[in-house]
Amino acid sequence: MAQISLHGTLHVTIYEVDKLHSGGGPHFFRKLVENIEETVGFGKGVSKLYATIDLEKARVGRTRILENEQSNPRWYESFHVYCAHQASNVIFTVKDDNPIGATLIGRAYVPVEELLDGEEIDRWVEILDEDKNPVHSGSKIHVKLQYFEVTKDRNWGQGIRSSKYPGVPYTYFSQRQGCKVSLYQDAHIPDKFVPQIPLAGGNYYEPHRCWEDVFDAITNAKHLIYITGWSVYTEISLIRDSRRPKPGGDITLGELLKKKASEGVRVLMLVWDDRTSVGLLKKDGLMATHDEETEHFFQNTDVHCVLCPRNPDDGGSFVQDLQISTMFTHHQKIVVVDSAMPNGDSQRRRIVSFVGGLDLCDGRYDSPFHSLFRTLDSAHHDDFHQPNFAGASIEKGGPREPWHDIHSRLEGPIAWDVLFNFEQRWRKQGGKDLLIQLRELEDVIIPPSPVMYPDDFEAWNVQLFRSIDGGAAFGFPETPEDAPEAGLVSGKDNIIDRSIQDAYIHAIRRAKNFIYIENQYFLGSSFGWSPDGIKPEDINALHLIPKELSLKILSKIAAGERFTVYIVVPMWPEGIPESASVQAILDWQKRTMEMMYKDIVQALKANGIIEDPRNYLTFFCLGNREVKKSGEYEPAEKPEPDTDYIRAQEARRFMIYVHTKMMIVDDEYIIIGSANINQRSMDGARDSEIAMGAYQPHHLSTRQPARGQIHGFRMSLWYEHLGMLDESFLNPESEECVRKVNQMAEKYWDLYSSETLEHDLPGHLLRYPIGVASEGDVTELPGTEFFPDTKARVLGAKSDYLPPILTT
């Protein structure tokens, strides 16, 4: 049967299955259970039935497990499914769970073409076996389905039409009004870095300084400092700009937190317990998070630091539980403090929160200059970070790995949502109940309340999103029936908050003109990958973001309208670039890009347009290259001969690591958080994440382009990356703009990768070194099989031994 495009939302209810066995007793089940017992040796088995929803081979929903209800399992569970798939059937699969996996009972098929008219289908569907014959008891499953095609959504392609936009629906946290947001590029910005960027109302863009603001927030807290991190390192200092000193600014983070705790401030920290850092695997952990050092530093002090493993929610199989605790992480990066009132009321306090991509750890402090060699005797002498070369050290010299990141400060009612997220996580994994009871402090700390009036031109509406499940957050509903009411999704016996993915999907679907993404990873929608050397259905990187982006571009090509997607990723994911895990991720990235370019090329041909697909979708990375200056730090030792390290040192170049997790849509809406564009971050039941989505109701892209803080922030980022500003940057969707940016990035790539170097690189934005063939295949750029100075393939390589769940 022909595959039909499903792009929109599917509402599905799975009610029950009737007569799963006939009058002859549950023979089928007895046999099944005996087989499982024999195979596994797990003792007497019980039936554990669950049902799944698949669009062809992509799993889009699953019910809870029902124990010992062999003949008439009744789930009565509803699902709200975003779809961007090709499918001929919606498939309902009934399975019996066991400790190692699951046994198929049968499948029921509802043809997609019956859904297209948007009418509700409510029916009993026959359950068939592998050969498409009815299972022997003539059993049926009762389901209800209704499909809402994306163009029927009144927000499709309309942007945020007014200040009455209610936010992303079906989420745990609703949108908050009257907030204030500060946007940060990098941990620090020196004075006078940003040129004049005009905003609406005759104003100019003013940058903020992240680690200075975090330092002030911690220093001035009087009641509580709550921190979560993938990594927190006590030895770093937050203040390092000699031109902007602060009283007490030379203190390390660890000493600052101890000092605040000794003053009576409640300091609580949840730091990911990197299980790989235990025992023989590796002394400093696969990812060197310093988790045990940090715990040790705060022992017997007033700071309560809890190492927090990524525990699975109850109900996974033995194998799944092992996967979650050893493969997945706590990735949220938040700081929550009490703070003075903006009006100077010295008695009352409010809550202020920070959310984004920056961990408070080593290797993160940087400025938009992203120097490789010139800060090695100052800001980075005691914070030399270079995990891409074995044995790299300050003694052997640069290049260090520069770090580009994005973060935010949230004030107003949204800040309390971040606090509530911390409280949920502490109650689940923090051990002792040490949380400050705000009710007892209500005469001091105000309740959640706006920090700006709705008619203030600088006010923000903000919504908090997460990827997290009941294994990491206390207070999620116990039953799947209650999950949708709380804006949550039910999984196989766990309740999941997957709202970060929902927020991205909604923002892409609303987009009118352009999308600008910076992210540490870009892979997913594996249901759309070519089966070249893999079985796409085995990969399970099913989040929709890449496919939603290409479907958005396709809709614009069909309508004859301009639309451009700009995506900035690192040259390679941090680590030894030749290693199997880095190469595997690059392979998934290539497959994702290729799926999108094939979609675009097909659409251009169908519409008779001859144009470079890179005018619609274009990928970049960041890099720097510096000539040697007199008076530069001279290392005492040299790297080993014939290594990537010595080659990069001699060529005076290295990538700038893009760690950001940000998307800007039409200069009116921004998402910033900890979540990467991969399955780990978007799944909800893998890495735990947090993000915010925000806009300024008085600066929407309705009648004319938006010129609020988000526009200023994007222009400031483009200035950082390109070393200049151009009039065309005001309209990123225009052919003039995308051609200009692509040309500059190609020029900078040529300078970066050339044999010789006469001047510093004039900008950091480099063309991602791939080609796009006439059918959309992603190819090597001529002469660029490997990244400069390495033997690491740009297009990556499939790993034969690392499971996809680890690298997607």
UniProtKB/Swiss-Prot annotation:
Entry GO terms, CC: endoplasmic reticulum; plasma membrane; plastid; vacuole
Residues the record lists as binding Ca(2+): 186, 370, 404, 720
Biological-process GO terms, alphabetical: lipid catabolic process; phosphatidylcholine metabolic process
Proregion residues excised on maturation: 1-30
InterPro entries in alphabetical order: C2_dom, C2_domain_sf, PLipase_D/transphosphatidylase, PLipase_D_C, PLipase_D_fam, PLipase_D_pln
Cofactor binding note of this UniProt entry: Ca(2+) requirement for activity depends on pH. Active either under acidic conditions with micromolar levels of calcium (PIP2-dependent) or at neutral pH with millimolar levels of calcium (PIP2-independent).
Catalytic reaction(s) noted: a 1,2-diacyl-sn-glycero-3-phosphocholine + H2O = a 1,2-diacyl-sn-glycero-3-phosphate + choline + H(+)
CDD domains on file: C2_plant_PLD, PLDc_pPLDalpha_1, PLDc_pPLDalpha_2
PROSITE patterns listed in its UniProt record: C2, PLD
Membrane topology: Peripheral membrane protein
GO molecular function, one term: phospholipase D activity
Tissue-specific expression: Expression is higher in radicle than in endosperm.
Domain named PLD phosphodiesterase: residues: 326-364, 654-681
The EC number(s) this enzyme carries: 3.1.4.4
Positions of the C2 domain: 1-125
Superkingdom of source: Eukaryota
Predominant location: cytoplasm
Subcellular location: Cytoplasm; Membrane; Vacuole; Endoplasmic reticulum
Protein's job: Hydrolyzes glycerol-phospholipids at the terminal phosphodiesteric bond. Plays an important role in various cellular processes, including phytohormone action, vesicular trafficking, secretion, cytoskeletal arrangement, meiosis, tumor promotion, pathogenesis, membrane deterioration and senescence.
Family designation: Belongs to the phospholipase D family. C2-PLD subfamily.
Miscellaneous field: The propeptide appears to play a key role in the proper folding and activation of the enzyme.
Protein's name according to its UniProt entry: Phospholipase D alpha 1
Origin species: Ricinus communis (Castor bean)
